[in-house]
């Protein structure tokens, strides 16, 4: 697929082959890849789909990957030198001529209704060629909190009854707390990244 995209986009105007802000990509890492990323500070990458929209990256494939995978959202700065823009689909979908052409040719476009006709520009997508993904490019780490019942038990100091659980639900909603899968960023993310790096280096003997 990547080869076909490259072939059909090679003659497009330059504005469809550049990005003007940072973009993001969610990856579900296996335990092996998590260790490789922590030990080597990078993972090999190739042609891949990115988005301008952090919210899209966070919600991709249902949000935080299931237990057993490590969810990571990488960020690429548009001024970084180590990537190439294959095609900026977001910019393409902002082009009225392209949108009109898609609409007029929709009967000849494979899976139009479930593909570009459905998503259109909702994913703010860019296709990049990236040699490596590094720990310094991690914008968010995915993880899971304890269950609601476990958290309520910690809060009340005992197994909560129905009335207490309702009160706990109220407190969670009032304070806008997410129970279950969540993304951590900033200083909290940095602490988790450093912990994973140190753990991976110990396990792989790369210290």
Where are the language model's segments positioned?
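Conserved NAD+-utilizing ADP-ribose enzyme module
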Residues: 1-21, 43-44, 54-71, 77-207
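Short linear interaction motifs
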Residues: 5, 31-32
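Short hydrophobic beta-strand segments
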Residues: 20-30
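Short, polar loop/linker segments at the starts of domains and inter-domain junctions
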Residues: 33-46
């Amino acid at each position: 697929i990547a080869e076909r995209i490259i072939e059909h986009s090679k003659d497009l105007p330059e504005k469809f082959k550049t990005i003007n802000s940072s973009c993001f990509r969610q990856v579900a890492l296996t335990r092996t890849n998590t260790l490789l990323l922590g030990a080597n500070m990078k993972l090999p990458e190739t042609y891949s789909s990115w988005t301008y929209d952090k919210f899209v990256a966070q919600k991709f494939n249902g949000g935080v990957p299931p237990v057993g995978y490590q969810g990571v959202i990488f960020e690429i700065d548009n001024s970084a030198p180590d990537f190439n823009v294959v095609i900026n689909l977001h910019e393409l979908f902002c082009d009225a001529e392209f949108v009109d052409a898609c609409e007029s040719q929709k009967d000849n476009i494979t899976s139009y209704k479930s593909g570009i006709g459905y998503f259109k520009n909702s994913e703010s997508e860019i296709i990049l060629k990236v040699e490596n993904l590094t720990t310094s490019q991690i914008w968010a780490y995915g993880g899971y909190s304890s269950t609601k019942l476990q958290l309520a038990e910690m809060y009340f100091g005992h197994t909560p009854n129905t009335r207490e659980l309702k009160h706990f639900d109220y407190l969670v909603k009032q304070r806008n707390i997410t129970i279950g899968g969540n993304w951590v960023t900033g200083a909290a993310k940095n602490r988790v990244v450093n912990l994973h790096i140190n753990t991976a280096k110990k396990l792989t003997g790369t210290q």
